[in-house]
């Protein structure tokens, strides 16, 4: 009962279904605050508390694992469905955070069934997601600063006018989708591999892992759609009239792009 209550509290802190409502509203905060909130601060507290509770609890009843993986799957699918109507880039990223944290809860839930690999992947994903989501939110903020809009339908031809922002957009989108060689690929792979290991003796877990793989592919397709719309081609009217990208922003983007690419193997080796 205590672990289930800890899990319930963790859902609230990490904006999982049914306690997700506060997070999309928080994206109205200034972009640096949103990047900190979604990347490294409040939303990560819940998953860290639950992970620590699992480590400290010893033998964890399987019911805790079942509740964790089932709610994670519901949240994962809900987060993806909420991608579809979004046109505001920051609001899309808010629902992306909800879905990405569900991967972490899924991996932690799998660890209850004996998968250390899934646990390691979940912990790695906390770090890897931080770099990718911080980059994506700061890219969105740069569009608001230079273009006066972050509405995706108005963003076309970004690479031609803002090559660094365009590359950052593409790298962050691929990272959120878990595409190699981006950092999140390595942590998602650990979670999925751990899930298949557990699923070898449990058909229900195997089905849930297959659904996770399908959701990951669908997420990639959705972000690929917006990459194909926003990045190539001639700049739209809003992009063509945009102000120059400040050098300080460009420097931060370059650093984060590098970290998104190299932090995956580093976090995996650090976790061991």
Where are these regions (language model features)?
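Cytoplasmic/organellar membrane-interface segments at the starts of transmembrane helices
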Residues: 159-167, 220-272
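Hydrophobic transmembrane alpha-helices and their helix-loop junctions in integral membrane proteins
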Residues: 1-229
């Amino acid at each position: 009962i205590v672990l289930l209550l800890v899990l319930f509290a963790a859902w609230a802190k990490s904006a999982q279904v049914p306690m997700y409502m506060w997070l999309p509203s928080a994206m109205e905060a200034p972009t640096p605050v949103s990047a900190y909130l979604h990347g490294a601060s409040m939303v990560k507290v819940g998953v860290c508390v639950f992970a620590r509770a699992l480590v400290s609890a010893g033998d964890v009843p399987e019911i805790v694992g079942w509740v964790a993986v089932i709610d994670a799957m519901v949240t994962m699918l809900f987060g993806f469905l909420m991608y579809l109507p979004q046109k505001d880039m920051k609001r899309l990223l808010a629902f992306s955070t909800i879905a990405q944290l569900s991967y972490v809860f899924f991996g932690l839930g799998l660890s209850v069934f004996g998968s250390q690999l899934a646990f390691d992947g979940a912990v790695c994903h906390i770090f890897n997601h931080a770099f990718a989501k911080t980059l994506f939110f700061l890219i969105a903020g740069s569009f608001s600063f230079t273009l006066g809009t972050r509405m995706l339908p108005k963003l076309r031809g970004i690479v031609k006018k803002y090559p660094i922002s365009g590359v950052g957009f593409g790298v962050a989108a691929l990272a959120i989708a878990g595409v190699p060689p981006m950092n999140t690929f390595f942590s998602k792979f650990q979670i999925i591999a751990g899930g298949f290991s557990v699923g070898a003796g449990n058909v229900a877990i195997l089905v849930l892992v297959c659904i996770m793989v399908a959701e990951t592919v669908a997420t990639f397709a959705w972000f690929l759609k917006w990459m194909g719309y926003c990045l190539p081609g001639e700049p739209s009217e809003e992009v063509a009239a945009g102000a120059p990208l400040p050098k300080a922003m460009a420097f931060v983007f370059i650093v984060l792009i590098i970290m998104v690419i190299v932090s995956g193997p580093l976090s995996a080796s650090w976790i061991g």
